[in-house]
From Swiss-Prot:
Gene (name only): hmw1
Pfam families on file: EAGR_box
Cellular location(s): Cell projection, Attachment organelle membrane
Cellular component GO terms, alphabetical: attachment organelle membrane; cell projection; plasma membrane
Species this protein is from: Mycoplasma pneumoniae (strain ATCC 29342 / M129 / Subtype 1) (Mycoplasmoides pneumoniae)
Protein name: Cytadherence high molecular weight protein 1
Keyword Coiled coil: yes
Swiss-Prot/TrEMBL keywords: Cell membrane, Cell projection, Coiled coil, Cytadherence, Membrane, Phosphoprotein, Virulence
Chief location: membrane
GO biological process: adhesion of symbiont to microvasculature
Lineage: Bacteria, Bacillati, Mycoplasmatota, Mycoplasmoidales, Mycoplasmoidaceae
Post-translational modification: Phosphorylated mainly on serine residues.
Record function comment: Component of the cytoskeleton-like structure which stabilizes the shape of the wall-less Mycoplasma. This cytoskeleton-like network of accessory proteins containing HMW proteins 1 to 5 allows the proper anchoring of cytadhesin proteins in the mycoplasmal membrane at the attachment organelle.
Coiled coil stretches, renumbered: 782-815, 849-880
Amino acid sequence: MKKSKEAVFEDKDYTEENPEQIFGNLYDGKLTVQDGKVKIAYDGDGNGYYIAFNSETGVYYDPYGDTEYDISVLFDANGNSFVFADAPTVEVLAGEQEQTEAEPDYLQYVGNEAYGYYDEAGEWVWSGYFEGDQWISTLPQTEAEEKQFGFEDNIETTPTASEDFGLEADVPAPEVAEPSYEVQPEVAAEPVYDVQPEVAVEPVGETTATVEPQAVEIQPEVVVEPIVESQLEQPVEVQAEMVQPEVAVEPQLEVSLDPIGETAPILEQVEPQAVQTQPEIPAEQSAVELQPEPVAEVQSEMVQPEAAAEPVTEAQQTEPTPVVETIAEITPQVVTEPVVAVVEHQPEAVAEPLPVEPAVAGVSELIPTEQVQPEVVVESTPVAEVQSEMVQPEVAVEPIVEPQPEQPVEVQPEVITTPEVASVLEVQPENPVVEVEQVVEPQPETPVEVQPEPVVETVQEAVAEPTQVVEPQPQAAPQPAVYEWNLTPEAAPVEQPEVIPVTVVESQATATAEPQPAVAPVADMDYVLHLTDTVKNQPQTAPVQPTTPIKIEVAESTPTVTTSPVEPTIAPPLFEIELNNTTSSDLPLVEVVDFKHNQHGAVGTHSFDDFTPPEVGMESKTHCHSNSEVVWRVSEPKTVPVPPAVSSINIQTVNRVVEPTISTPTTPVVESAPAIEIFVDTPPVETKEASSNVDVVQQPVKPLMPVMVEQLRTTELQPTTEINLFANSDINSIIAELKQGRSNPAINFDDIFKMSSYQMVVKKSFVQISDFITNSKTDITNRFLLIKKELQAELTRLIEENEQLKAEFLNAKDLSVYQKDELLRSLSNDFTIAHRPSDSYEQLQKSGELVRNIQKAILENESKIKNIQITLKELKAVYKLCSDTVLNGMAKLDSVLRFNKKEKDPLLLNSMETLSSFETEPQAIIEDLLDFSSSFDKMSNEQLDEFVYQNLDSGLNLDLDGFDHQLSSMNIHGLEPLDPMKLDDFDFETLTPDKTSNLSSILDDELMENGGDFNLDY
């Protein structure tokens, strides 16, 4: 509707109370402001908007259009944030939605015969009606009750007690596991057991592994507890009803794995009476913190008749062995189940002594006598054979990581003889084996037939008397321990003993050594032996003195001694190292001589523990002079399989001096652990009889500043005495010559001040600087010309390629246009069927794809051409900057060589002959010399230049030309990154260029000008 000009532009007093005066009468039956459904909001500029709210979508929109608004950026008439007051909140909408969802959906009962039926026409007919949630049937009462029962049975399924118990039975909490035996018969009905059930170690959560202090001598019994009668009978009935033959009532096995693995849980079956009165295993009395432990994984339900136990270490034999009732003791109890699951993971028994409290419970008479496990006490013997009369599932226990010799434990498997379990074996393989993954140490595995104590019995002979050193006699070479590495595939892998006790007597020569003369007594010396454990960087309190390190590396069965003396010492201590093995095979001992040196050569021994072969790195340091010190580093390296090696140690004594001569076989280097140092402090030696004749291998001292050494090597400034003007090596002789007062001393000024040497060094320096600048300029020019040539060649190639692509593009475009016309023509006449327009369409598609590819290649080439042009421009600018830097260096060098020349040369006075006649004052002779009364830092540049650089260019050939070299073929890929600013490091800051110098002959101007021309237009 058009309005008159006066109606539109009439001057009226528009107010916010009457917005219709602004927008006119727009009411067409829609929402209006008067009914409260439409609000007015304003933006930041004062523009007004009609706002309505859609309760279904929650969107604010224009009621007279389709525009949606964000009210967070709008304001009301007072300038506050706009709020749509009548808009229902989100909570109200949510409540309505919940109310809508709460209404019963009666359509879900369509098709259920309890609520109706389908008539002949296929339409659903209700047999009653709903009052709220209540179904009221109009059928006869008996039928209605049955239907109602069916309805409730289909709609609501109340959880049974078995389901409630099934959910609780999987929880290993103690308070939940006790009442589980009261409703145990319904466990098999739980569908959760279709998946492999989690088997806990204990039927009662409270019966975790406890500790008893006096468990070293008395080993707890292996108790087999009966299962509840209801557990044996009820699962069969439930299985018959639920038709689940694979469901088995598994004894709840709770694998109590301590985070450190300090205790081994006790697996046992307890009667319900013992469950409720469990006095011996309260949680607070246990020395182990009770925590929910991971439940052992159950493999496919099979009876495992074999069990392979891990070797038992001797450390474990001397410590309490917790009772571990394996699944073998529990499997016969589940006599009514067709399938018996086997625990995959066996809890570890760690050799840390903790008090174990044996859990004893009564044995049920329901279990046959042949199933009862007798008391098994593990003897503390190297090989323990545990024969069990129970069904032993083959469960490989994880190896205990202990650096102790482990011995195998042979377990004799038994065959199930109970009639209940015999039925299980009928449907299962005869020998189902659960292969448990074993943690294999990086060591060669040995068969079960490992000798109990593989000790090299080569040092059982008596050591020399402490007060006397006798002549060593040849003896048989130590027999290395031989192991059979023939492992059969069926043999279970047994961990090799990590520690092979080795005994070495250093004072005795082996078969490969010749007899040596006896050692005479040495000076009286008292040594103090003390053992310290070094931790990483332990500071040494002894003073730093030249040392003689003796490194001894012992292989598996024989030692390896490496000697690297650094400096001869006075009266080296007579020492003896013996690696002795104890019968306990717990901790091998190292017997080290306590150095009690006296006039009679007495030698005593001390033994210390915490020494672990097979690989021992020992380092001996002996300080000379007053404080002699021997440091032995005994390290515990990681076990590395090393073939048995035989080493010979020859102790030679020459002139009362012990000179160790060691021949060692090559053995692998072992990564050593933190070392143990033995410091042997020795008092000063007063006698000179025991002089050392040890061969000294003096290691060269590494230079502190290899960079400076390299720089000096590349320069010609080798004579350092020429550089140092203040060297006082010959000044004393000069002074003595002058003091004699001779009329013609044989000394000239040059000898006094060494200026000739100085001049030669300076000249050589300038020659090197000149050569460096010349070579730098040549290198810069060659690099620039080569890069420029390659880039221009690439530009030419890209331009030619683009021209060819443009021609191909035109041809492909014409072809696509022709094919398009042909396709349209074939579709518009009767030739369509014979022409097969589908082929024409495919050809047109191929032509179009070809056109697009050519166009893409052209655009890429154009981008490359543009980038290369920009690179050439930047390269030219950088080249000019580098050239200017080199020119600056040349100008400074020229100014230095030609600055302020003078005719007189005071250094031409080669002798002091003129001083013979006192007609000339000495001050007048040396007036042209530099005044040395002032310090060097107070000299002016003019004085320095006048004194130093006079006539330096005489005979100095500085050929700075030669920049017109021809461009040689170079590989651009071998160039180093261009760094134009690196030449600034060679700037001479203390020198100023001569403004009058003419360097036009230094550079080839034509080369400089033509080197940066570019032909960037293509």
